[in-house]
Amino acid sequence: MRSLIVVLGPTAVGKTKVAIFLAKYFQSPIISVDSRQLYKELPIGTAAPSIVELNQVKHYFVASLSVTDYYNASKFEKEAIALISNLHQKYQTIIACGGSMLYLDALCRGIDEIPTIDPKLRMNILSVYRKEGIDSILRQLRTHDPTFYNLVDLKNHKRVIHALEICLMTGKPYSQLRCGNVKKRSFNIIKIGLNRERQELYNRISIRVDKMIENGLLEEARRVYPYHHFNSLNTVGYKELFQFFDGKYTLDFAIEKIKRNTRIYSRKQIAWFKKDKEINWFYPNNIDEFETSCLLDTISHKSILLT
């Protein structure tokens, strides 16, 4: 049976390096599972694969959309599964790589169909939002779906409101609806998780952000600032710089906020992934070395068990 090897883990842990190693070893392409690397205007702030890396291995779902395009995990699931089906006609093994939690769940587990919201319910929720503010909505979401409450960006009011709409419409937690029923895939899935000691990961995050600034993140953010109201740009690395452009932050403070918010996001990723008992975890000894033989042995062993 054909396989999909999924390399996942928190931001800045070193997923791309491992994914490219595996892609070269298996002579296969890479499917990016990153909800922001999709956007062609954001190569620096999303740590998208470099031109050299893209030339080394064929990547899919990288720089394929504009920030003005609407996209979600449901669309990704449909397109990625169709692509994998086609690629498996040529490749025995395909590599997927990313850290976007909902997109990974969409790929590996599938997403239930999201129902259409009753207009009256939507009006009622929006009325509460206008009268009482986002805090009232957040309290309700925490009651109905504490899992998604701990995952979502609480400053993304649109996403918070939509999640509450789904909870009240279906009587089920939004997080459960998104990945409650596991869809059987036509291929084996082997999950490789990467993690590091917390302080080492934090140091890598800090170094990465500094390099992003050196490489032109400020200019990149300025170019997309006219589109800052799009959900694609409501993400760490850009929203903080938009505050700087608006005169609300100093540049130094914005950079520190990027580092802090990235650390927070990494903790959410780790907490989310730790719930998945199918993940085979690896902890590199230092920032440059990775025990590739152990990794390949694990993949081989899992492949045998799944056949």
UniProtKB/Swiss-Prot annotation:
Q: What class of enzyme is it?
A: transferase
Q: Where does substrate bind?
A: T11, A12, V13, G14, K15, T16
| Reactions performed catalytically | adenosine(37) in tRNA + dimethylallyl diphosphate = N(6)-dimethylallyladenosine(37) in tRNA + diphosphate
Q: What is its EC number?
A: 2.5.1.75
Q: Which GO terms describe its molecular function?
A: ATP binding; tRNA dimethylallyltransferase activity
- Cofactor(s) the record lists: Mg(2+)
Q: Name one Pfam family in it.
A: IPPT
The record, for SUPFAM superfamilies, names: P-loop containing nucleoside triphosphate hydrolases
Kindly list the residues the record flags as site (Interaction with substrate tRNA).
S100, R122
One biological process term in Gene Ontology: tRNA modification
Task: Report the InterPro entries cross-referenced here.
Answer: Dimethylallyltransferase, IPT, P-loop_NTPase
Q: Which residue stretches belong to region Interaction with substrate tRNA?
A: 34-37
Q: Which UniProt keywords apply?
A: ATP-binding, Magnesium, Nucleotide-binding, Transferase, tRNA processing
The entry's ATP-binding residues are G9, P10, T11, A12, V13, G14, K15, T16
The function of this protein is: Catalyzes the transfer of a dimethylallyl group onto the adenine at position 37 in tRNAs that read codons beginning with uridine, leading to the formation of N6-(dimethylallyl)adenosine (i(6)A).
Cross-referenced HAMAP family: IPP_trans (MF_00185)
Similarity field: Belongs to the IPP transferase family.
Task: Provide the assembly information.
Answer: Monomer.
Q: NCBIfam families of this UniProt entry?
A: miaA
Q: What is this protein called?
A: tRNA dimethylallyltransferase 2
Name the source organism: Azobacteroides pseudotrichonymphae genomovar. CFP2
The organism's taxonomy opens as: Bacteria, Pseudomonadati, Bacteroidota, Bacteroidia, Bacteroidales
